[in-house]
Structures are given as structure tokens and as C-alpha cells.
């Protein structure tokens, strides 16, 4: 760390106008820092390297994007990765990881466009990887028609993502077959029988608890009415409390149905993104 701090002080001025060999040495040192997980220091140095050569500029942009990717600053990472020119040997890796980063932050249309603009030789491994990534992005968009068109080409012939192709097909089936639980229906069900809407929403334990709680309050209120009459303060207070919990039971059931859909979709998105990520690390290792 002392050596790193010393070099940071030494390299406090931008490296513009330096010879190519000097810039290459600085980039080698940056890669050494990255390998030691000194990400902040490596990014500090990269901000100060401004080579005149296009190939070296591509290397700087790639490394900046790569460091930001490791720091999980995915939006900014994609910005720098997309600046790598088509002439660079890092172009393909940059585009694939940029598309993944964009998909991860929800910029699905842009991620799809990045992939669509790439062209490779048919039947090649990287062409199959492109097809796989586009299928995953389509699934994140819930575009099942586009997913099916890409999934036709899943052949399982490349070990880097053969299992992930199978996984994506499974996720597609789960998304297509997922029950569509309506918040309105959940609310109506709980209006008739407290807690039933939560059972409908897939929250059985919560539904049973709600039924018992509202039921117990209702029985208590009825007991006050039977013993003390409708004008008694205990009956009035108990009626008010029961009414509040009854209405809350209806509202809670509607929210539970909506929450269940959100949780399911979020979980599926995380699984898809995970399976999109693994092949990239395997293919470009």
C-alpha cells in the first residue's frame, strides 16, 4: 500500500504526450493493481492516462469500464466499455459485458441493441453466445416470442453455457405458467372471508393468521353486544377496532397479491441475470 501511495503521488499529473512505451508500462502497472484488487487506485491512475494512440485509448477505456464493473458501478462501466472501438481486440468482450451491465440496471432495450449490432460467423461459439444473451434479454423483457426464436438455436454444444441454455428454458416456462393473482379478487375474497385473499395470493400462513385475528375480534364484539347492548362503550370501541382490522385485512390481501407478483418477477430476473453472467466469465476468462 505504501508503494501504491508513492506512485499515486508520483503520477499526479496526466500522462498525455508520453510515448507509447511509457503508456504501456503505466497500463501494465494498472493491471497489476487490478490483480491485487486495488480498484480505487487503478481507477485514479486511469483517469490520468490520455494516450494519443487509438489502441491504447481503447485499452484505457476498457480498463476503466472493467474496474467500474468490478465495483458494481454498472451504468458507468457500460459507458466506457461502449467507447472501445471495433478495431480493438477487446471490442467483443467490451460489447458483451456492456450489454450485460445495461441489462442488469434495467436498460433492456439498449442492451438488446448492443447485442443486435454485433455480427459473427454462423455456428461459431461467440455467435451462439450472442444468441444466448439475446434470449436472456428477451426473457427479462418478458418478450416470449423473441425468446422462442432465439431458444430454437439452443443446441447445448458449448460447455461454457450449455446448462444455462437449459435453465433459461425452465425460467421461460415458469414465467409463462405463473398464476396471475389479481389484487381486486384478493380484496373481494377477504371481504367475504377474512384472510382468504391472502391464501389466494399464496400467503397461506398470513391468511390463516388474519382469519383467526379478525374472527376473534368479531366474536369479542358480538359478545359485548349480546351481554351489554349496542349502546355500551365497550361494544362501540370493540366494533371500531374490529372494523379497522377488517378493512385492513381487505387492503392487506390486495397488497399481498401485488407483492407476490413483484417478488416472483424479481426472483426470476435475478436468476436470469445470474445465468447470463456465468457464460461471459467462462467464455472471456
Residue ranges and their predicted role:
Residues 59, 93-100, 107, 170-285:
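Hydrophobic alpha-helical membrane segments
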Residues 3-13:
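Sec-dependent N-terminal signal peptides
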Residues 20-174:
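Alpha-helical protein-protein interaction scaffolds
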Amino acid at each position: 500500500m505504501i508503494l501504491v501511495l508513492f506512485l499515486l503521488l508520483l503520477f499526479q499529473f496526466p500522462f498525455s504526450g508520453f510515448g507509447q512505451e511509457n503508456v504501456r508500462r503505466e497500463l501494465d502497472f494498472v493491471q497489476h493493481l487490478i490483480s491485487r484488487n486495488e480498484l480505487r487506485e487503478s481507477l485514479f491512475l486511469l483517469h490520468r492516462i490520455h494516450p494519443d494512440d487509438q489502441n491504447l485509448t481503447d485499452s484505457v477505456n476498457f480498463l476503466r469500464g472493467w474496474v467500474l464493473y468490478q465495483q458494481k458501478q454498472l451504468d458507468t462501466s457500460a459507458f466506457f466499455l461502449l467507447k472501445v472501438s471495433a478495431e480493438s481486440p477487446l471490442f467483443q468482450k467490451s460489447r458483451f459485458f456492456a450489454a450485460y451491465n445495461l441489462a442488469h440496471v434495467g436498460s433492456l432495450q439498449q442492451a438488446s441493441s448492443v447485442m443486435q449490432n454485433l455480427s459473427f460467423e454462423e455456428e461459431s461459439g461467440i455467435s451462439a453466445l450472442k444468441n444466448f444473451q439475446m434470449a436472456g434479454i428477451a426473457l427479462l423483457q418478458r418478450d416470449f416470442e423473441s425468446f422462442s426464436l432465439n431458444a430454437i438455436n439452443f443446441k447445448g454444444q458449448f460447455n461454457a453455457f450449455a446448462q444455462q441454455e437449459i435453465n433459461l428454458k425452465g425460467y421461460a416456462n415458469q414465467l409463462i405458467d405463473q398464476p396471475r393473482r389479481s389484487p381486486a379478487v384478493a380484496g373481494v375474497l377477504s371481504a367475504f372471508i377474512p384472510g382468504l385473499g391472502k391464501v389466494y395470493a399464496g400467503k397461506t400462513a398470513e391468511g390463516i393468521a388474519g382469519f383467526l385475528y379478525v374472527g376473534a375480534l368479531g366474536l369479542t364484539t358480538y359478545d359485548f353486544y349480546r351481554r351489554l347492548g349496542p349502546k355500551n362503550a365497550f361494544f362501540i370501541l370493540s366494533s371500531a377496532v374490529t372494523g379497522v382490522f377488517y378493512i385492513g385485512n381487505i387492503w392487506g390481501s390486495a397488497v399481498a397479491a401485488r407483492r407476490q407478483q413483484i417478488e416472483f418477477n424479481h426472483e426470476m430476473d435475478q436468476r436470469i441475470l445470474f445465468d447470463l453472467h456465468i457464460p461471459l466469465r467462462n467464455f472471456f476468462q
